[in-house]
Amino acid sequence: MAKENRTVKKVTTIQKTQVSSKHNTVSVTLVKSFHGRLPSHRETIVGLGLKRINHTKKFKDTSEIRGMINKVSYLLKVEN
């Protein structure tokens, strides 16, 4: 059997998200330590990118982010 040489072109699209718009963002601050919490809750905090107490990040207000916030809401302060 003869080998076929196939070339595959990968096409990537980069979606730019603007986090700076006022009405579609959520500001999240870690107010309690996540040490000693459930592993899934720790992973959620790490997934949000929060590293230490009083660390704040802004996110685009999506259902995925809202679900993560709801899971660990007892550790966070959320502002619109």
From Swiss-Prot:
<comment type="subunit">
    <text>Part of the 50S ribosomal subunit.</text>
</comment>
<dbReference type="InterPro" id="IPR016082">
    <property type="entry name" value="Ribosomal_uL30_ferredoxin-like"/>
</dbReference>
<dbReference type="GO" id="GO:0006412">
    <property type="term" value="P:translation"/>
</dbReference>
<protein>
    <recommendedName>
        <fullName>Large ribosomal subunit protein uL30</fullName>
    </recommendedName>
</protein>
<dbReference type="GO" id="GO:0003735">
    <property type="term" value="F:structural constituent of ribosome"/>
</dbReference>
<dbReference type="GO" id="GO:0022625">
    <property type="term" value="C:cytosolic large ribosomal subunit"/>
</dbReference>
<dbReference type="InterPro" id="IPR036919">
    <property type="entry name" value="Ribo_uL30_ferredoxin-like_sf"/>
</dbReference>
<dbReference type="Pfam" id="PF00327">
    <property type="entry name" value="Ribosomal_L30"/>
</dbReference>
<keyword id="KW-0687">Ribonucleoprotein</keyword>
<keyword id="KW-0689">Ribosomal protein</keyword>
<comment type="similarity">
    <text>Belongs to the universal ribosomal protein uL30 family.</text>
</comment>
<dbReference type="InterPro" id="IPR005996">
    <property type="entry name" value="Ribosomal_uL30_bac-type"/>
</dbReference>
